[in-house]
Amino acid sequence: PAAEAAEVQQEQTAAPAEQETALPADAQTAGEPEQQLTYVALGDSITSGVGLADMKYNIAQIGYDLRPNFEGYSSQCYTALVGKGLGLDRQHAINLGLPSLMSPDMVDMVQSSAMPKMNQASGSYYVYPEYQEYLRKADIISIQIGSNDALVPCIVGLGEATNWKSEQLAGLMVSGALRDFNFQKLGLFLEALNRMVLTFDESRATNRLLFRGMDEICDQAYTNVTNSLPQIVAGIRALNPDAKIVLLGYTNPVPLLPAWNRYFSKLNRFAKDLAAQEGLIYVDIPRTQTAADGHP
């Protein structure tokens, strides 16, 4: 009768739906592109790739605009190498390295995507509304910061001690012009050095800086970094609680100065302890070699 026919018809129309839902998961996703992780590298000039010929930037009203380098960075910088190792394209391996950045500046960038004012000592000023957005989308975030907290006061102190006769030499060294040292670059270095004809008072002030002032500079830098790093980690977690955070260790670009050796040794211990306490990944880099410009 009619009731039985209706039941048969209902079973026949239901069968295709059952077959459709029974398709294997891999068949349903066939043809879709494989989803990539997103890696974001935070840092200063070491991260950005200063000294590498194909680093990208524009001249800004204050300092430099690093936006072109966020995805157009050098193929030799470590963001590129990590991205290549993870099989990531440029849209999924982001270089947020900002030259001259100090650790309190990175706190500002993580918390608000902007420095509230120019850092007078370093001459840097960065405002990038997309900075936080990159952090929100990241699966892995590495942090490299702290070298400039000692280097910038050192350069400023040397300038003050020499009445800024050291400015050309310091600018030459940090610009990357002395990278891959050769006889031509040795000539540039000696020319800048010969222009530093110091008076007796300038020589005395320079010696005082190198042998006593460095301890004060490095002690203050250590305080700045150890206060800032936990804030940076907390700021990242507020934006993206699921991201894996990697703390990069420190290498000393000025190994001849005992104060700097102590500074970077203490920072490595602090970063390692912080990683253990906060569930971060700590990566030691003891064998990193630096060029004459202080960059790896």
Model-derived segments and their meaning:
Residues 50-52, 105, 111-220, 252-254:
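Oxyanion-hole/transition-state-stabilizing segment in secreted/luminal serine hydrolases
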Residues 38-41, 47, 93-97, 140-144, ...:
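Structural recognition of the beta-strand scaffold that forms the well-ordered cores
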Residues 74, 78, 127, 221, ...:
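Stable alpha-helical elements in mature extracytoplasmic
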Residues 250-296:
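Catalytic His-Asp segment of secreted/periplasmic serine-dependent ester chemistry enzymes
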Residues 81-89, 228-246, 270-284:
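A structural motif corresponding to the C-terminal end of an alpha-helix
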Residues 64-71, 215-222, 259-260:
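Second-shell loop/turn segments in exported
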Residues 21-99:
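Serine-esterase "nucleophile elbow" of acetyl-processing enzymes
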